[in-house]
Amino acid sequence: MSQLEQRLGPNLRLEWKLLNQEKASSLEFLRLCDKMIKVGEFLLAHDVAKAGLRKHKKDRKLSQKAAHALSKAGSPMMATKILEELVAGGDRDVETHSLLASAYKDLWEYSSDKESKIKYAELAIARYEEAYATNSFDSLRTSQRQDLETQYYPCINIAFMHFMSGDLDKGRESAEKARQICKKLKDKGTYDYWIQVTEAEALLLLGSFDEAAFTYRSATKREESQPSQIASTRKQALQIASVYEDEDILAKVLLAFPKLGIVACSGHVIDGPGNARRFPPEAESEVKRKIEEALE
């Protein structure tokens, strides 16, 4: 399925409108949230999570989704408040700590003064390390795949934050651990988009520029890759490349990613309700096909 078909396929707003909020299970709210986050409907995803929490007040995963959606929508400070409450309540889940760390990373990025940058970088690293420490790399040599799948994300972000904060040695040490985790997962038959771009980022941090660019390029061509995922990956890759202060490295990383465009649509209703039909309904599917062809 193409990225365009994935984006246009579900009518998420209609699905949300039709959801029976009084009878819906927490799982139904979560599934809808996931769909919306996947295609970049972050504010709508937050609305769904909030509605779900009104009915399922203690649901940890719905709280996680609400915070995740807020972060993605550009409100990381509000997200930290939700997640810090979960942690204060005894939540030691890897996902909670990873999301909290990610929100602090966003605050680090948005901060303009040095003091705030240092503060949020330290908070982000501490939370990523908390997530990673639930099953440290040293104890994962004989670990099952499920454990490994929770570790590559905090590990690569520890590497990223150290590297961007100027501690290149610590950054590369964690990058090598992340690369090894990805290798283990690949050997076990698990190698999705996020694992592949994590491997690419580790290679970039370690200075293997050609291999990193090749791995990024391969990941963006995967059938399941989403434009929002590629944009996020590209942004972080360019941040790392800029640290090297070498235009050739930056150019190499830029060329590894496709150019993502923005489509703006405008128009008016051809045939108003109750008026005689002027546009033949049988032509609608052909027009849709032509538009999709042009966008692809």
Task: Please annotate each region the language model reported.
Residues 1-35, 55-72, 91-112, 136-138, ...:
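Amphipathic alpha-helical repeat scaffolds of TPR domains
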Residues 16-20, 46, 50-54, 80, ...:
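A conserved position within tetratricopeptide repeats
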Residues 39-52, 60-83, 125-129, 147-161, ...:
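Internal alpha-helical scaffold/solenoid segments in large eukaryotic proteins
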Residues 41, 246, 251, 257-293:
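Eukaryotic intrinsically disordered, low-complexity segments enriched for acidic and Ser/Thr/Pro residues
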Residues 163, 176-180, 209-227, 255-258:
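TPR/TPR-like (Sel1-like) alpha-helical repeat modules
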Residues 174-180, 184-198, 202-205:
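Structured C-terminal portions of repeat-based eukaryotic scaffold domains
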